Amino acid sequence: MKLKSLALLLMTIAMPAMAEQVSVNSKGISLILDVENGKPAQYLYFGSKLNAADLQNLTVATNGRMDAYPAYGLNTPAEAALAMRHSDGNLSTVLVATGSDVKQEANATVTTIHLKDPVYNIKVDLKYRAYKDVDMIEAWTEISNGEKGTVTLTTFASAMLPIRRGDVWMSHLSGTWAAEAQLSHEKLQPGEFVIRNNDGVRNSHTDHAEVMFSLNGKGQENTGAVIGAALAYSGNYKLKTVTDDTEYHYFFAGINEQNSEYHLKKGETFKTPALVLTYSNEGLSGASRNFHKWGRKYVLAHGDQERDILLNSWEGVYFDINQKGMDQMMADIHSMGGELFVMDDGWFGKKYPRKKDNTALGDWVVDTEKLPDGIEGLLRDAKKNGVKFGIWIEPEMTNTKSELYEKHPDWVIKAPKRDAVVGRGGTQLVLDLGNPKVQDFVFGVVDDLLTKYPEIAYIKWDANMAIMNHGSQYLSAADQSHLYIAYHQGFAKVIDRIRAKYKDVVIQCCASGGARANWGCLRGFDEFWVSDNTDALQRIYMQYGTSYFFPAIAMASH
């Protein structure tokens, strides 16, 4: 009986390749598409869940472009979700439906709409995961190359959504260092509204990859129809809303393709990040609650567990780490009812001790002058003081003044034939996570710490530099445009390896403040640092904005 139940969970239900409605339903919302063999798949509806009678009355709108995944080439004035250069140089692509299927998961259904180019051996699968107990739908795309040679993807959105014109307003977050996540509301006007990121490593200091569309006027907290959308990606992104002479706005979201055209080799499949969609008739707060429920249950590590009250050493001592001082801080936080102490930057480096921010990143060995009893002594003191112990690392980075850089200068991201632009301390550089050897090294930083010191309960993972230099010493000259995408593919592989081995450790993603507040990172982390600004009054506004898309449990605080 158990075997039979398992088989049913994994069963794929094939649907006939003919004109039909494909319904993607969560607990209370529906996404309906028209899928007819040999024609483009088209949107019919997105909103509150429909019953059978409602479905019978749906028709494809004629006053807008309803293609579910519009391709470039035969309607060049229109915005496209997909554009490519075929192996013979042809820039035109046509996508028509060949059928659909549904796969049952434990708490969701995954609907796939199969598309292909009738002339070229290009297949595109539109994927929709609808959760059974929360009103969220994840939409992503998988593009497969069956041509004889390499094709070049120049535009590859995760998804497109048409929104009927009217009094439609967009709510989104923007800001800067120490003033992140400021909420703005703007009415959609004719033209293009673009939110994009080019940082390379982090992506939410200035703008966020999450938006809400209020369909009945300026967004209200508890009333009105609202569409929420979040691109679950840790790297460069682009959200674009196009309003032209039709009756619709067209919302596109995906990886920012600027300087990132992707060469898809024969037999390969490219998978986009997911665009997470929700809908609510209970205003902005209703959409927020959907994000919170989904994130806590299906994305965040330990999303159902209370976070410990912690003290971090940074604001107290900065780089002035020492054994006695750490012991005293542990005693102090315990006396105030705290449960966790986190030792921040400044604890490492042998040949180049970390006395300030220009040395030792990559040399993850204890500075025994500062900490003569090592991490063992810190763990002993934590136990004595009745608190857990956590530690700071920045494993994606190095300094030119480090043993790591001396051994592996070929591991850094650097433009060929040019001096590298350096970051913090005048020496910081970014390691190339597209390189499998670098991935092994970064995994090893965490693995070594947690293998030697399994009592470590918490890791603060920082990232204090953007990719300033476009150049991978690992990728071929022809594939240099893969740099940003390869970096985040490598980042995801590392986080997956860490989580597979260390499920219980709590990990915070920090990035010069709130630069990694995104659902792409949170798939492997417990929380993110909201801002380096810890002023209590100013934090209210930043956490208020952040709360539109992220639950309070995801906002780290110390």
Language model features with spans:
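N-terminal signal peptide c-region/cleavage motif recognized by signal peptidases
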Residues: A14-P16
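Active-site and adjacent substrate-binding regions of carbohydrate-active enzymes
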Residues: G28, T141-I143, Y318, G349, ...
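Glycan-recognition surfaces
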Residues: N399, Y405-D440, G444, I485-H558
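Sec-dependent signal peptide recognition
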Residues: K2-L9
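Glycine-rich, aromatic-flanked loop segments that form ligand/cofactor-binding clefts
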Residues: A68-V96, F213-K240, Y279-L300, G338-D345, ...
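Polysaccharide-binding surfaces and accessory modules of carbohydrate-active proteins
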Residues: E20-I32, K39-V242, Q258
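Aromatic-lined carbohydrate-binding/catalytic grooves of carbohydrate-active enzymes
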Residues: H302-G444, Y453, A457-Y458
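Short Pro-Gly-centered flexible turn/kink motifs
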Residues: V22, M84, L91-A97, Y262-N281
